[in-house]
Amino acid sequence: MSLKEKTQSLFANAFGYPATHTIQAPGRVNLIGEHTDYNDGFVLPCAIDYQTVISCAPRDDRKVRVMAADYENQLDEFSLDAPIVAHENYQWANYVRGVVKHLQLRNNSFGGVDMVISGNVPQGAGLSSSASLEVAVGTVLQQLYHLPLDGAQIALNGQEAENQFVGCNCGIMDQLISALGKKDHALLIDCRSLGTKAVSMPKGVAVVIINSNFKRTLVGSEYNTRREQCETGARFFQQPALRDVTIEEFNAVAHELDPIVAKRVRHILTENARTVEAASALEQGDLKRMGELMAESHASMRDDFEITVPQIDTLVEIVKAVIGDKGGVRMTGGGFGGCIVALIPEELVPAVQQAVAEQYEAKTGIKETFYVCKPSQGAGQC
């Protein structure tokens, strides 16, 4: 049973009438451009065919009813006419409440709604299950009530809800790619202007995501430290962000910087350049060059930004040994565990899966999770 069929069936059973719309919003993986977002730089994600699906219908009053199929059909109810506050027990409900609350601040011309939500974006794998939920809820209200909001505004609304209502600091990339993703394309995003450019993906290439299942512990504190080091670097160059520093300017004075800060700055400057070049390589179908750029990105994250762990490096090496120069592989996400992403010719996927199954657990004692994805369409009706 598809998520669409599941949510429509649950909707009819729970609310006693059929849903009028079914909306989906996808998760994402970032192909290249790591830790560049908060430095006003470039990222190159694609939406994946794992998504949050909501069957819904407008109500003729001001009540919102939400059922979470993936949380034992828990039900949340609240009114649009009362202040929207955090739910005491259901964390999932706060993503919904936050999106609705912030949407009211943007455009309050919508009424009540019934929703049943289900998703298959793996949670805790860094594939943006929360952004997918936020964008799905925003799209539901935009579609049901014909709100004059575009995908970028729905994405910004989701980011605000996560930052201010849920209380989790995040950039804009995750929501933006979920809202604006394009089938068979990646999206080059300028994190300063929020400008986007669709980049066609080569035919016959699979997007493979492998979760190391190494439990991330340092990610919060180390993330903040990296951010501070980048801000220190920008101040040294008297610029608002590292986006505004050239590699030539850096090389001329790198010896004057604190050695650790210099390494962090070098990663951001080179990663930005790699990300822009990667968009061109992908568009031209040059998988060999894309693979080189992904390898350079991984080495930079390992040696200059120091955010990989041995388990992740092991996974990358296993995959690289199979694909050679026919594709690319690197860590993706914040670091200290999580996932790797690989662009692999479809015919090599079984060999990669076999090599990882045979070697990764033997070397690390941890069993991986393997996902084969397609670059998918952003949020909309399904």
UniProtKB/Swiss-Prot annotation:
UniProt site (Transition state stabilizer): R28
Pfam families, per the entry: GalKase_gal_bdg, GHMP_kinases_C, GHMP_kinases_N
Recorded family membership: Belongs to the GHMP kinase family. GalK subfamily.
GO MF term list: ATP binding; galactokinase activity; magnesium ion binding
NCBIfam families tied to this protein: gal_kin (TIGR00131), PRK05101.1 (NF003472)
First-level EC class: transferase
Pathway: Carbohydrate metabolism; galactose metabolism
Catalysed reactions, semicolon-separated: alpha-D-galactose + ATP = alpha-D-galactose 1-phosphate + ADP + H(+)
Amino-acid positions noted as binding substrate in the UniProt annotation, renumbered to this chain: E34, H35, T36, D37, Y223
Residue sites binding ATP per the record: G124, A125, G126, L127, S128, S129, S130
Record function comment: Catalyzes the transfer of the gamma-phosphate of ATP to D-galactose to form alpha-D-galactose-1-phosphate (Gal-1-P). To a lesser extent, is also able to phosphorylate 2-deoxy-D-galactose and D-galactosamine. Is not able to use D-galacturonic acid, D-talose, L-altrose, and L-glucose as substrates.
Protein name as catalogued: Galactokinase
Entry's Gene Ontology BP terms: galactose catabolic process via UDP-galactose, Leloir pathway; galactose metabolic process
Localization: Cytoplasm
Positions bound to Mg(2+): S130, E162
Active-site residues annotated for this sequence: D174
Predominant place of localization: cytoplasm
Keyword Transcription regulation among record annotations: no
Effect ascribed to mutating Y371H: Displays relaxed substrate specificity since it gains kinase activity toward sugars as diverse as D-galacturonic acid, D-talose, L-altrose, and L-glucose
Protein source organism: Escherichia coli (strain K12)
